[in-house]
């Protein structure tokens, strides 16, 4: 047996990784081409757009993985938490624990070459997830009670992430191949590209910034500088002229916000 082929190597392949997210990004081109070839009814493509924009990008990434699991900006009911778990994990980028570890390092070592997992430090090519960096706890230790809590609750999903995604994808296939293709594979793959682009755009000029178009760009969180300045704030719109679309969308889940980290004296 080759030295690299070991139980430890197999275990690593089951966890979230760059190769799996990159596979999602590459596969989506073939999936779109096949979807066009199938010549399905128009509403399947409407479903694709909805699942890309709302289910995976807004709910899965922005609200679930980022605001809820990583930062704990609010609490929700049990059923909503499981909905968040599914919509976030099925994107292909990772689950609560891996996402939070990556994001914690991103905040702590923002724009530090060789350490910040994503953004301009890895170049424009990092829009393709393969060229982002994976977090190495030995190099950048993470000391966080919140991360420990995520590990205790969702460690099983971290260890068996790829089987979880593939099993759920298989269930969607059994329901209907078009559900699998148009409501998961295509929109989730596009979401991977969109998120890869967003984390690069949010750090133009090698520093976090607020997008001047944030009021119109409601899919990706545009007030990124505000988020870095006040990471515990549930609402990144800290000025009267700003709007945090992710915060506004999250209200449909009737969350209980933790306002302790919200600034109240920010001037224009």
What spans do the regions from the language model cover?
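Non-catalytic, topology-defining segments of multipass membrane proteins
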Residues: 1-197, 233-268
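Glycine/small-residue-rich hydrophobic helix-like segments
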Residues: 198-244
């Amino acid at each position: 047996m080759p030295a690299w082929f070991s139980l430890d190597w197999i275990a690593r392949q089951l966890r979230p990784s760059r190769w799996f997210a990159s596979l999602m990004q590459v596969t989506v081109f073939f999936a779109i081409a096949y979807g066009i070839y199938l010549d399905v009814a128009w509403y399947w493509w409407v479903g694709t757009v909805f699942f890309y924009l709302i289910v995976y990008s807004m709910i899965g990434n922005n609200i679930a993985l980022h605001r809820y699991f990583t930062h704990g900006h609010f609490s929700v009911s049990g059923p909503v938490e499981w909905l968040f778990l599914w919509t976030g994990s099925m994107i292909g980028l990772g689950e609560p624990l891996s996402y939070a570890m990556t994001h914690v390092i991103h905040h702590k070592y923002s724009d530090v070459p060789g350490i910040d997992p994503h953004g301009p430090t890895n170049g424009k090519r990092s829009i393709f997830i393969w060229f982002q960096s994976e977090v190495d706890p030995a190099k950048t230790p993470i000391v966080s009670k919140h991360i420990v809590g995520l590990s205790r609750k969702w460690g099983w999903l971290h260890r068996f992430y790829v089987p979880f995604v593939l099993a759920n994808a298989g269930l969607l296939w059994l329901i209907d191949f078009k559900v699998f293709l148009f409501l998961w594979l295509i929109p989730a793959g596009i979401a991977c590209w969109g998120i890869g682009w967003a984390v690069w755009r949010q750090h133009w000029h090698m520093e976090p910034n607020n997008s001047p178009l944030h009021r119109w760009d409601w899919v990706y969180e545009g007030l990124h500088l505000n988020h870095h300045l006040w990471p515990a704030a549930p609402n990144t719109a800290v000025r009267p002229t700003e709007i945090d679309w992710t915060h506004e969308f999250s209200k449909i889940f009737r969350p209980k916000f933790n306002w302790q980290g919200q600034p109240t004296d920010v001037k224009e």
